[in-house]
Amino acid sequence: MSLHRSSQKSRAAEVDVIVNALNPAYTDWEVDLPWMTAAVTDAAKATGATVLIPGNVYNYGQNLPPRLSAATPHIGDHKKARQRIEMEAAYRSNGVKTIILRGGDFIDTAPGDNWFEGQMTAKVAKGKVAYPGPTNLKHTWAFLPNMARAAEMLAARRGTLPEFADIGFPGYALTGDE
């Protein structure tokens, strides 16, 4: 779907669910997230479509508790967390039916632009592996094919969900040592 607001509205008239999986570069979030959110909410309001967003765990802050749930507070103790919290608040306050399927860092069987391949294993041929933190601490991961199936099931059941549904995707929690 085009990033232009008028184009999104006309194209969205043909759909029941808008999947907003656009992810600009982190350095562009401050500028891009607000207008992208406005464009998607405008299109959803104009057509009655539900918005489905693959969410992340940034909202919970830097010091995650051992177990996350919908009741885990959104801390906003770093810039990316605050930006995601603001984006999600815009969906909640704009009267748009929204489903956030919240998961850890993405992993997949196919090459792509994700943290696992772009950072962790980018230099594995040289015998180097990077890890997002101490290797003895758990890190959350979402296997994309499984998360996509969960998103599809949620979209099919959107009529039974609340106006703003924040749903955790269980995924995997592994240490670097594991």
Language-model features: locations:
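A conserved structural motif in NAD(P)-dependent oxidoreductases
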Residues: 142-147
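Conserved Rossmann-fold NAD(P)-dependent oxidoreductase catalytic core, especially the SDR/UDP-sugar
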Residues: 20, 24, 37-85, 99
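Conserved beta-loop-beta element that borders a ligand/cofactor-binding pocket
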Residues: 56, 89-110
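NAD(P)-dependent short-chain dehydrogenase/reductase
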Residues: 104-139
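Mid/C-terminal beta-alpha module of Rossmann-like enzyme folds, strongest
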Residues: 150-178
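A generic structural signal for well-ordered alpha-helical segments
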Residues: 44, 91, 123-124
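NAD(P)H-binding glycine-rich loop region in Rossmannoid oxidoreductase-like domains
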Residues: 1-47
